[in-house]
Amino acid sequence: MSRYRGPRLRISRRLGDLPGLTRKISKKLSPAGEHGQQLRKPSEYSLRLEEKQKLRFNYGLSEKQLSKYIKIAKKVTGSTGLILLQILEMRLDNVIFRLGLSPTLPAARQLVNHGHILINKQKVSICSYQCKPGDIIDVQAKDSSQNLVKRYLSFPTLVGIPNHLELNTKTLNAKINAIVERESVALQMNELLVVEYYSRK
């Protein structure tokens, strides 16, 4: 299954607030669908599936990518759910978004893909690059890069900059101070249900 490229607001209405996916908030109270969905008690499977979908759509991942990250997280000592979130949060595209250098994750992905971002003075155009403590992030010095990011910074942010990141808005220079903590993850979801979903496949 490839990365979703359809209407973002429809997904947000179905799954709830996904800060990485869209800045828009639906004014409709009914869930997505022609007449909304009938309210009924969800099954355990549907609950696990919904949490998995939240993760996939918020971080803009394909099913194959998310499955790969689950396998990586399971090989690391510790809570698989927390490690999974840390892997996703430390992706370069997500770090750019959490710093406020872009209004959404899709916009952050474009900044990275188009070569606007430097890591430790080297251009990195791979969105999945795993940032680590000590990394220095800069915006390219050329006017097109600087002006685009400055325009993005003028947008009101949906979530604040987490404690493990710091940003100088004048120089457009940022630093990663630590691995993200669970309480700094902006997405409201239950990562344990995602681990259960893949464990039962």
Swiss-Prot record:
It comes from the Eukaryota. Its main location: plastid. GO terms for biological process: ribosomal small subunit biogenesis; translation. Residues 90-153 form the S4 RNA-binding domain. Pfam families: Ribosomal_S4, S4. Keywords: Chloroplast, Plastid, Ribonucleoprotein, Ribosomal protein, RNA-binding, rRNA-binding. GO terms for molecular function: rRNA binding; structural constituent of ribosome. HAMAP family: Ribosomal_uS4_B (MF_01306_B). One of the primary rRNA binding proteins, it binds directly to 16S rRNA where it nucleates assembly of the body of the 30S subunit. With S5 and S12 plays an important role in translational accuracy. PANTHER family: 30S 40S RIBOSOMAL PROTEIN, SMALL RIBOSOMAL SUBUNIT PROTEIN US4M. Belongs to the universal ribosomal protein uS4 family. Part of the 30S ribosomal subunit. Contacts protein S5. The interaction surface between S4 and S5 is involved in control of translational fidelity. This is Small ribosomal subunit protein uS4c. The lineage of its organism: Eukaryota, Rhodophyta, Florideophyceae, Rhodymeniophycidae, Gracilariales. The gene is rps4.
